[in-house]
């Protein structure tokens, strides 16, 4: 009799995805970030669910409900700290995952890649609406500034902003709908992640060489199930360490002050994981131009497969493209730093240069280098 995991309609899907899945034998630790993202999502949904049991989405009580969670709810402080810092780990894993895809040419699985970009946008949206919920100063002013950007769209802009606010300013209606979105979107992300996996399993995983690995596959379990488990343990150690020892390290002190529409904080800035995009937004003096640059800073990822010119898949054997890749990484770090600085000389100029380099690398330098490497190797 055949094994139940191979015959049962539900179990055979799980079996095909996590047990008997043929995986390349040489995928490195860079291939762990995908499963870590799954772990992050589960952690965030669970901690978020328990927080939602005690949170009230009303401007008069939101801030104090979080104080209540941290003071009076059993382990509420821990649940909140894990949820707040879990978001940071989520984005660390996301950026590593995208970087791996870019370095090794995994973006040539176009459906998987494009759904991945959609997942990135959904996660950014979820994190943004989530940051508004504590109703601190940075929550309120962040919501005001970022939603206000939509008013840059010609003709419909102002109507659009008021429609999102549910009134003429960021108020109770805004907080209530943001809570609704923040509760709903993670489940949309979970659904999209399943589609992401479905498309990935149509082709199988890429590997560090970028060559076809059909001749050398191993079963996912036990090899990569244990490798993933090691990643899980290491990440959870990191997450618990930061949640227990310095939970406010990555937060903004302004958010410990309840929202006050009459007092603007000296520096309005988002959480660290959005600073690179915020720097690109601020580097353009025109409002609509800034908004479009902000959108395109993420959507440019969708152009990466189209702009792939090399005859080789990954950057493993391409030293010139490697230099450009690490230049892009350095450039993103510079943008992240600039995003947290005040709008004054020399930061404005550095931000504009870094933003120009960011788009030039994606749209000009990487495609040209791929073409050049083909020429050098006489691969016409």
UniProtKB/Swiss-Prot annotation:
Q: Which residues does the record give as a ubiquinone binding sites?
A: 201
Transmembrane segments annotated in the record for this chain: 33-53, 77-98, 113-133, 178-198, 226-246, 288-308, 320-340, 347-367
Q: Is Iron included in the keywords of this UniProt record?
A: yes
Origin organism of this chain?
Polyodon spathula (North American paddlefish)
Co-factor note (free text): Binds 2 heme b groups non-covalently.
- Function summary: Component of the ubiquinol-cytochrome c reductase complex (complex III or cytochrome b-c1 complex) that is part of the mitochondrial respiratory chain. The b-c1 complex mediates electron transfer from ubiquinol to cytochrome c. Contributes to the generation of a proton gradient across the mitochondrial membrane that is then used for ATP synthesis.
Provide the taxonomic classification. Answer: Eukaryota, Metazoa, Chordata, Craniata, Vertebrata
Give the residues the record marks as binding heme b b562.
83, 182
Q: What is this protein called?
A: Cytochrome b
Q: Which domain of life is it from?
A: Eukaryota
Q: What SUPFAM superfamilies does the annotation carry?
A: a domain/subunit of cytochrome bc1 complex (Ubiquinol-cytochrome c reductase), Transmembrane di-heme cytochromes
The UniProt entry, under InterPro entries, shows:
Cyt_b/b6_C, Cyt_b/b6_C_sf, Cyt_b/b6_N, Cytb/b6-like_sf, Cytochrome_b, Cytochrome_b_C_euk/bac, Cytochrome_b_N_euk/bac, Di-haem_cyt_TM
Quote one Gene Ontology molecular function term: ubiquinol-cytochrome-c reductase activity
Q: How does it sit in the membrane?
A: Multi-pass membrane protein
Residue sites binding heme b b566 per the record: 97, 196
State the disulfide connectivity: none
Which GO cellular component terms, listed alphabetically, does the Swiss-Prot or TrEMBL entry include? Answer: mitochondrial inner membrane; respiratory chain complex III
């Amino acid at each position: 009799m055949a094994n139940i995991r191979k015959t049962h309609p539900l179990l055979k899907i799980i079996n095909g995805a996590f047990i008997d899945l043929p995986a390349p034998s040489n995928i490195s630790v860079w291939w762990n970030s995908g499963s870590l993202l799954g772990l992050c999502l589960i952690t965030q949904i669970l901690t978020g669910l328990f927080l939602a049991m005690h949170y009230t989405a009303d401007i008069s009580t939101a801030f104090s409900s979080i104080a209540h969670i941290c003071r009076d709810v059993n382990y509420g402080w821990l649940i909140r700290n894990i949820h707040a810092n879990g978001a940071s780990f989520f984005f660390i894993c996301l950026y590593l995952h995208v970087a791996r895809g870019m370095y090794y040419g995994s973006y040539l699985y176009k459906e998987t890649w494009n759904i991945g970009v959609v997942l990135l946008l959904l996660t950014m949206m979820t994190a943004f609406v989530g940051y508004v919920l504590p109703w601190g100063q940075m929550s309120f002013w962040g919501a005001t500034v970022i939603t206000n950007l939509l008013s840059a769209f010609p003709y419909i802009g102002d109507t659009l902003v008021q429609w999102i606010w549910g009134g003429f300013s960021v108020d109770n209606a805004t907080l209530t709908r943001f809570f609704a979105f923040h509760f709903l979107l993670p489940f949309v992300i979970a659904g999209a992640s399943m589609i992401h996996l479905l498309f990935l399993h149509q082709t199988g995983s890429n590997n560090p060489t970028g060559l076809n690995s059909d001749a050398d596959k191993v079963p996912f379990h036990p090899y990569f199930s244990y490798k993933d488990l090691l990643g899980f343990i290491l990440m959870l150690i990191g997450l618990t360490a930061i949640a227990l020892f310095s939970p406010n390290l990555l937060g903004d002190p302004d958010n410990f002050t309840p929202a006050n529409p009459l007092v603007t904080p000296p520096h309005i800035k988002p959480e660290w994981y959005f600073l690179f995009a915020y720097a690109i937004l601020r580097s353009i003096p025109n409002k609509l131009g800034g908004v479009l640059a902000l959108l395109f800073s993420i959507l440019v990822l969708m152009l990466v497969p189209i702009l792939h010119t090399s005859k080789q898949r990954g950057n493993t054997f391409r030293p010139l493209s490697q230099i450009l890749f690490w230049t892009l990484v350095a450039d993103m770090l510079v943008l992240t730093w600039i995003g947290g600085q005040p709008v004054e000389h020399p930061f404005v100029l550095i931000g504009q240069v870094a933003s120009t380099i960011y788009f030039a690398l994606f749209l000009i330098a990487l495609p040209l280098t791929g073409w050049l490497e083909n020429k050098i190797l006489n691969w016409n």
